[in-house]
Swiss-Prot record:
HAMAP family: HisC_aminotrans_2. Keywords: Amino-acid biosynthesis, Aminotransferase, Histidine biosynthesis, Pyridoxal phosphate, Transferase. It comes from Burkholderia lata (strain ATCC 17760 / DSM 23089 / LMG 22485 / NCIMB 9086 / R18194 / 383). PANTHER family: HISTIDINOL-PHOSPHATE AMINOTRANSFERASE (PTHR42885:SF2), HISTIDINOL-PHOSPHATE AMINOTRANSFERASE-RELATED (PTHR42885). Its EC number is 2.6.1.9. It catalyses: L-histidinol phosphate + 2-oxoglutarate = 3-(imidazol-4-yl)-2-oxopropyl phosphate + L-glutamate. SUPFAM superfamilies: PLP-dependent transferases. The gene is hisC2. CDD domains: AAT_like. This is Histidinol-phosphate aminotransferase 2.
């Protein structure tokens, strides 16, 4: 702490990202990255943009990412003016807190959810109300039907992996017409239904996406918001008061190429889903209790072994999983679905550790 810190900085509890081990060949199953590389079209698009000399890099990028927005809008069968692009979905969420969620009623989100939400709330002075999940970690829809303030939750939820059916999401959106409802769909492509199909019917709905998970671009930082033009305009007003050029040239062409290669995208998602099923069966055989997942990770606990101790012992073997020292989930591990070889290494290590 320093005497130069502002009051708000002194009060902040920053988000703690998953460990990025500086090892040659870790089995890295702790940050929900895609185990497969991006589409070959992405690599080719970056090479074309750079050319032989990289001369394009001396020019500022398109501040509104027009070509990318048009491609993504076509993919989702919406209009470009319904698409906002940011430097990763975390930045999109940050702008959303500033632009749409600070009102005289508290913002509601689950008590077990993406831990960046309370961080943003403290940073931007947004009142919040934590809504407890059910004992099985599902979102209780009836808890969000009273139009008592903004609503924000991931679908599928993180770190649990549970997903709400689209009909339940629509019930929540329809029941809160006086507030913005934000659905964070970072993991939607691995088994849930997207609410993007609802944005033309509900002017209070904002849907957030990322290229970090299903499109293997965590290293490029590209995120989106989808909603009616008035909501998107609010996000643009914040963006242009903060950074008019949030998305660099390489990120724009990479994301556009990733969206254009739908065959590769679909095949990669299918591989992850199949591996998730395989990993779930293997963990079940080791007596883990596993939360049903529609994401690229599983959330599991062992009834006879401490989760923190398991994570520490795995780390000694250069196998990394995520352990949260938080109420209700401190005996759970969040395990990213890796390649089959990575998952086999994890299961083999667990078999030895639990023997």
């Amino acid at each position: 702490m320093s005497r130069y810190w502002s009051d708000i900085v002194q009060q902040l509890v920053p988000y703690v990202p998953g460990e990025q081990p500086a090892l040659a060949h870790p089995v890295k199953l702790n940050t929900n990255e895609n185990p497969y590389p991006p589409s070959p079209r992405v690599v080719a698009a970056i090479a074309r943009e750079l050319g032989e000399t990289g001369d394009t890099l001396r020019r500022y990028p398109d501040p509104v990412a027009r070509a990318l927005r048009e491609t993504v809008a076509t993919h989702h069968r919406i209009k470009p003016e319904q698409v906002f692009v940011g430097n990763g979905s975390d930045e999109v969420l940050a702008h959303t807190f500033q632009a749409l969620l600070k009102h005289d009623r508290p913002l509601r989100f689950p008590d077990i959810t993406y831990s960046f939400y309370p961080t943003y709330a403290r940073l931007y002075g947004v009142q919040t109300s934590n809504v407890p999940l059910a004992d099985d970690f599902s979102i209780r829809v009836d808890d969000y039907l009273d139009d008592a303030g903004g609503v924000l939750f991931p679908n599928p939820n993180a770190p649990t992996g549970r997903a709400l059916p689209l009909a339940d999401v629509e019930r929540i959106v329809a029941a809160n017409p006086s507030s913005v409802v934000v659905i964070d769909e970072a993991y939607v492509d691995f088994g849930a239904q997207s609410a993007i199909t609802l944005i033309d019917r509900y002017p209070n709905l904002l849907v957030v996406h990322t290229t970090s998970k299903a499109r293997s671009l965590a290293g490029m930082r590209v995120g989106f918001a989808f909603g009616e033009a008035a909501l998107i305009d609010a996000l643009n007003r914040v963006k242009d008061s903060f950074n008019s050029y949030p998305l660099d040239r390489l990120a724009q062409v990479a994301a556009q190429a990733a969206y254009e290669d739908t065959d590769y995208f679909n095949a990669t998602c299918r591989r992850v889903i199949d591996s998730r099923t395989r990993l779930t069966h293997a963990l079940d055989a080791l007596d883990f209790n596993i939360v049903p997942s529609a994401a690229n990770f599983v959330f599991a606990r062992h009834p006879a072994h401490d989760a923190g101790a398991i994570a520490a012992k795995l780390k000694e073997r250069e196998i990394f999983v995520r352990h949260f020292r938080l109420p209700r989930i401190d005996q759970h591990l969040r395990i990213t679905v890796g390649t089959d070889a990575e998952c086999d290494a994890l299961v083999a290590a667990l078999r030895e550790l639990l023997a």
